[in-house]
Amino acid sequence: MDTWHDALGGEKQQPYFQEILNAVRQERLSGQIIYPPAADVFNAFRLTAFDRVKAVILGQDPYHGAGQAHGLAFSVRQGIRIPPSLLNIYKELETDIEGFSIPAHGCLTAWAEQGVLLLNTVLTVRAGQAHSHALLGWERFTDTVIRQLATHRKHLVFMLWGGYAQQKGRLIDSQNHLILTAPHPSPLSAYRGFFGCRHFSQANSYLSRHGIDPINWKL
């Protein structure tokens, strides 16, 4: 199993998946603003090939502000103000990774291109309404993504931040992969243990131990 098509082709033919796409399409046609734009919904898969995934960072649903979401969890387009959770991720990187300095942008495409799958468990959202598409069925699809990676790949790093993401740990065999957990980087919880978690250096140590090139986290 080498490609996302191999891993997910059957899933995308399932009636529930077609129903999700139709529901989102109908909302867009009715004039509802949906993020990210239609062309960006599956960017995480476009930028990070199945056989090149090294690490998975799980988000919840996309940013719901104008111009923010572009299909990668926690990431925003160049020129968009860095959101608070991402700024806290940068602050942790600054203390964890030697030579990392906080960039002036929040675009994480460079990570995705190196094999960091930035996966939101829900892939769309209505403008200004967090979790508005939480019940559409996206999680059934993204649970399959996690399960397929955990089953058909070896020595991946899964970063699960916050209770919601940590529920997905049940889909992953910790004998074959590294599961790193911490509180969410949100300003509400970052000081309860996200700061100081050192997940990024731990990820690189694990990858190196298994003969896999580490990730250059610098942006």
Swiss-Prot record:
What biological process terms from GO does the record include? base-excision repair, AP site formation via deaminated base removal
Recorded hits in Pfam families, A to Z, give: UDG
GO MF terms, alphabetically ordered = uracil DNA N-glycosylase activity
Compartments reported by the entry: Cytoplasm
The record's GO CC annotations read: cytoplasm
In short, the EC number is 3.2.2.27
- Entry function: Excises uracil residues from the DNA which can arise as a result of misincorporation of dUMP residues by DNA polymerase or due to deamination of cytosine.
Q: Which HAMAP family match?
A: UDG
Please report the name of this protein according to its UniProt entry: Uracil-DNA glycosylase
